[in-house]
């Protein structure tokens, strides 16, 4: 009987221990959950407090009085600046103690207090996104070795563009001004753009490419504004090269006959270009390269020395130059032995560099068509016939179409 009682007491004690152990575990789990909820709520509170602070700062900024935007003309002493505010006029204003006067340069945009006209902030230059897209971020990978048959032109463009950027002290010692720009003219496909990209590569300059037709805008003053912002962007990213292709679209000769608002807007754009060419200094490492295949219609004011310092002609390549261009473009091709590139070049009398490159591409396509991994002499001959007779085949196809 006594043993039975002892057994019952032990069982009841074990049950009590298990009961309270379970209660303790449940309480610890509840405490853990409450702690996690508290931390989550604290994180939410911190986020909301940060949001409230940002909104208060934004409200404070909105409640502050606005500022005038002006353009610095020149500094006047240690703490005075002459600023132009449109449309009010010019003012001599004080500089805030927080701004270093060494950072203030002509033609930069600044913010002025609306009550005291004190200069309080230097603003970034305003550049149109369309103008920003004209700048090629990556330096062109073209080199002089990729240009064939233009040794004379390469030498002349080196003297005018590359030498002033790399060795400006030579011009200072001689006492002559640095050239500002050059004009490349010749038939299409003769290597004008390729040589401009090669110069930008060897001078390690920012390359800004713009077509003249992009500067012809619909509304009055838009083309002139884009020209101004183009040169502003070039100054900010100096040393830089501005390559203006198809310059004849805005630089044609002016005539007295009224051709409508479109022609007058093109003339305004050209006048702004002339103004910018006269306004910037060649020592600022900004060079202008223009290209055209219609030099006969360009305005004489654009071609005068001081704006365009050298005019370089790009004639159709000679037989030796054509052979060299073929060797350059076929350098990476898998050719069979015995291919006579010189004889192929002699057959392409009057062809441009672009057509010679097209012959190499077409020869590879003929080999690809026959599922070969090498290019033969016959492929080149077929490619020459196809490229040079492209116009004839087009006329024949049109005649067949209308029969």
Swiss-Prot record:
GO biological process, one term: proteasome-mediated ubiquitin-dependent protein catabolic process
Disulfide feature: none
Cellular localisation: Cytoplasm; Nucleus
Binding site for ATP: 186-193
Predominant location category: cytoplasm
The keyword Cytoplasm appears for this protein: yes
InterPro entries: 26S_Proteasome_ATPase, AAA+_ATPase, AAA_lid_3, ATPase_AAA_core, ATPase_AAA_CS, NA-bd_OB-fold, P-loop_NTPase, Prot_ATP_ID_OB_2nd
Keywords annotated in UniProt: ATP-binding, Cytoplasm, Nucleotide-binding, Nucleus, Proteasome
One cellular component (GO) term of this entry: nuclear envelope
GO MF terms, alphabetically ordered: ATP binding; ATP hydrolysis activity; proteasome-activating activity
Gene3D superfamilies per UniProt: 1.10.8.60, Nucleic acid-binding proteins (2.40.50.140), P-loop containing nucleotide triphosphate hydrolases (3.40.50.300)
Family: Belongs to the AAA ATPase family.
Protein task: The 26S proteasome is involved in the ATP-dependent degradation of ubiquitinated proteins. The regulatory (or ATPase) complex confers ATP dependency and substrate specificity to the 26S complex.
Protein name: 26S proteasome regulatory subunit 8 homolog
Organism field: Schizosaccharomyces pombe (strain 972 / ATCC 24843) (Fission yeast)
Gene that this sequence comes from: let1
